[in-house]
Every structure is written in structure tokens, then in C-alpha cells.
């Protein structure tokens, strides 16, 4: 905490010639807080960044992601919907909102519609493909989910895709394959919270 306070003080002490410099200083501080896992403080500070450029969808998207990390799913949803209202083809917002709904197990048909719309704009994106697989799993379409998630993982060996693919395999009774995928995920990032939570919830030990 002492080092964090020191680093924040250094950022704040940097000279700023105008509004753009001031915003960049705030963004540097937000990034520092994010890296230290101080998501609530990062979210609050990002709100100040957004207030300086409220029409900047990328800044609002960053605030939405921090709202999610800070445990504010409704606020995340509000921010993402505000982006989509302004820019309906902002596929990152469509995907993030669809995935959030799917992950919480709410409004699953809307989640699927949002993710399919995101895929129209970015059909090769493995993370959006992952979201589609996850919503299909939540809808109970496990075999379809498996095929989609295998495609996503083939495109991108990502730890969170591994967590989802492993869970679908586990639910289908393919436990050895699930454990193998999770081991791959742990090799990519053994500290990932999504994978750790999945393993704990399922009582699995790769």
C-alpha cells in the first residue's frame, strides 16, 4: 500500500500542460490501480476520466470493464448499453454485455442475440466465439457449446477459453479431456481467477 501511494503521488506530481495531459495522468493512475487489483478505486477514477470525454466509447468501455471487476454488474450493463446506443457496431461492447448476461445466467436469449450481433462485425474473433460457446452451454446446448469452444481454443490458446471448454467437457463426462485442457490453461496462466474458480467449484484437480 505504501508503494502504491508513492507511485500515485509521483503520477500526480507530473506537470500537465492542458486537459489532455491531465487525462493521461488520470489514466496512468487508473492503470496502476488496475494492476494492483484496486478495482473499486480504479473504477471511481475512470469515471473522472470519462467525465472529461463522455463521448469517447473506448474510455466508457474501460469504465464498464472496471465496474465488472469492482462487482457492479448493473453499472457495467448501463455503461455498455450507452455505448451500443451511440455505436451499434461496437462489437466489444456487444460481446461484453452478452457474456456478462450469460455468465450470470440471466436473459440468455438476449445474451445470445448480442453475441451473434458481435460476431457479425468480428466473425473470426476467438473471444466472441468463446462467448457464444458459453451462452450455448448456459442454454443447455452442451454439444453445440463444445464444438464452438473447441474452435475458439484452436484459434486462441487462452486461459479463460480453456476454463470454459474444460467445464463443458466435464459436464459431458469427458473428464480426462477436461483435466488436460485445464492443465494447458494453468500452463498459460496459473493465477487466472476464472480458471481457479472453475476448478474450485467443480472440485477438480488437474
What is the predicted function of each stretch?
Residues 1-206:
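Alpha-solenoid helical repeat scaffolds
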